[in-house]
Amino acid sequence: MTSAASHSADVVIVGGAVMGSSAAYHLLSDPGFKGRVIVVEKDPTYQLSASALSAASIRQQYSSAVNIRISLYGIQFLRSIGDRLAVDGDRPEIGLKEGGYLYCASEAGASVLAENQALQAAEGADILFLKPDELKARFPWLNVEDLAAGTWGRSGEGWFDGWGLLQAFRRKARSLGAEYVKGEVAEVEREGNAVVAVRLKDGTRIACGTLVNCAGSGGRALAEMAGVRIPVQAKRRYVFTFSCKEPVENCPLLIDTSGAYARPEGEGAFICGASPEADVDPDWFDEDPASQEIDFSFFEEFIWPSLAHRVPAFEAIRPGRAWSGPYDMCLLDHNAIVGQAGDVKNFYLCNGFSGHGLQQSPAIGRGLAELIVHGVFRTLDLSELGYERVLANRPLLERNVI
């Protein structure tokens, strides 16, 4: 971390985790950008960052074309990360494993799964629609008695080292000239319809030509400092680990009809989780130690029974460690808010990823850089994710939310 000695930058990015670091990297990689980039990060250990605490996976199985396209680029980026983010010949490794996602559906959900798969295939994603006998043939350990269908990502989906991705983006951005400053924004200064500076809690003032909000769980508060309201709330999510002695061969990231999920994490080891019902979904506050508490009854009473029903081998498991982390939920439609912030012409939003941030970071960082440097999206049109839909109360509905 450096100090902002000259107190000015062409672009100030608030939030130095995976999204902010991706934006910094893509900005400084653009031949059309010649400016200075300062990334303000309040906790350079990233101890409570969603990037570090995520289940770190990527899928193409969305119900909206823009999300599918974002992830199609994302998997291309992750496959070639060693070339893209190498620094002085040191190629980062993120242990990408393309084991696929397996969505399970009952009779009630089968038609939606079929519609989604048709769109995914039309966009070029390698997703198969499987009937119960086909599911059983591919995954003999799976209980299909109450299933009507499933969709499985034959390629292009899987999991990886999220911490490794964050560090690779950060290291590459710094090698290109990004300056990381430890600090927390206390104030955003505006003159008319433009942001002119941010002031940190230690009193440091950093003038800026452009301000980018990649502040994660602090994104709503930062937006409000700039006079912008976004429907984003940080929610608490738990990740539980367990081990299973009985082999569950070629296990993908399994999503049960109940919403519980599990994926392999090494030989005989798994991680799992689920989203609570809305009326019992706890908020997350970075400064509140209670936000880091773990509700083990949620695992014992809901997640474990759901997974054991779907995979009988999971009836006899050994629970392991667990952790909680922030999940920055877009309350409008569970989709990210990306782009220029309404009337504040030089303030850009990158918030509310609702659990999709790691996998979407390559495409979103690239898109933000294009918008800042060129004024338009040049490669992948992300305008459907823009702030305009918030102002118009026009949700971009996504049916595949975990």
Please annotate each region the language model reported.
Residues 65, 69-72, 103-112, 152-171, ...:
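Short beta-strand to alpha-helix junction loop
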Residues 202-251:
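Central helical "cap/lid" subdomain
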